[in-house]
Every structure is written in structure tokens, then in C-alpha cells.
Design a protein with these regions (language model features):
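Local cysteine-cluster metal-coordination motifs and their immediate loop/turn environment
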Residues: 1-2, 90-119
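Short microdomains enriched in Cys/His and/or Lys/Arg
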Residues: 117-128
Length: 128
């Protein structure tokens, strides 16, 4: 995200979710237009889910990482609104080159290895 910001004239809004207290946000501040925070405890920012902080229609593109249930909800919302979405998938990876098939995930294009083919995929490929 930070590399894209440096290379293109774009505005980045960072939406982050934490259990109780935020961290490392000052490292992102120089590169983003706005930082939105949600915490489970309500200690900082919005009390609730990070997905509550955004209306995807206000964005041209959404990039997400985190719990799969959150990414799925966000990606499906983006798909429904016609907003480009990228998801960063996580799996336990044994070999890192796709040989062991330990990180295989079923996609719209068949089984793909997260380590070799990803880890970032278009939301439509994973959650369509």
C-alpha cells in the first residue's frame, strides 16, 4: 500500500481493527489521508468491527488482510457494489513453492497455491 501511494497520485484511507489498543499507526500516517480505528473493547476509536468504518462505495479499490470471515464479507460487499477488491490470503506454508500443496485454496479458477500464486488475489477470484 505504501509503495502504491509513493508511485501514484492517490488518496489512501487506512481502516484498522484491534482487540484493545492500536499500534504502529504513526508509521502509516505520512502515507495516508485518513486513519480509521475500531477496537473490540471500545478503548480506542469505534467499538465494533473494522468493516463498520467504511462504505465501500466511497473507494475505487479496497485492499484487505485479516480474518477470512472479515475479508469474505468485505470482498462480497465490494463485488456487489462494483468496487475492485484485493484480499491477502494466509495459510500455513511448508515448501513455499507450491510443490507440497499444503496451502491450496479453491478459487474461481480452480485450486491455487497461496504461496506460489498469491498471496494476494482479486476478491472475485476467492469469494465470487
Amino acid at each position: 500500500m505504501l509503495t502504491v501511494k509513493k508511485l501514484q497520485d492517490c488518496e489512501v484511507t487506512l481502516c484498522c481493527g484491534f482487540r484493545d489498543k492500536s499500534y504502529s499507526l504513526d508509521e502509516f500516517a505520512p502515507y495516508v489521508k485518513e486513519i480509521r480505528v475500531a477496537t473490540d473493547s471500545g478503548r480506542e476509536g469505534h467499538k465494533g468491527f473494522v468493516t463498520d468504518l467504511l462504505d465501500v462505495a466511497e473507494f475505487d479499490c479496497v485492499v484487505t488482510c485479516g480474518p477470512e470471515v472479515m475479508m469474505e464479507k468485505l470482498a462480497k460487499t465490494c463485488i456487489a457494489k462494483g468496487v475492485k477488491c484485493y484480499v491477502s490470503m494466509e495459510r500455513h506454508m511448508a515448501c513455499g513453492v507450491g510443490a507440497c500443496l499444503g496451502c491450496t485454496h479453491e478459487t474461481a479458477h480452480g485450486a491455487r497455491c497461496i504461496c506460489k500464486d498469491g498471496p494476494v488475489f482479486e476478491g472475485e477470484e476467492i469469494y465470487a
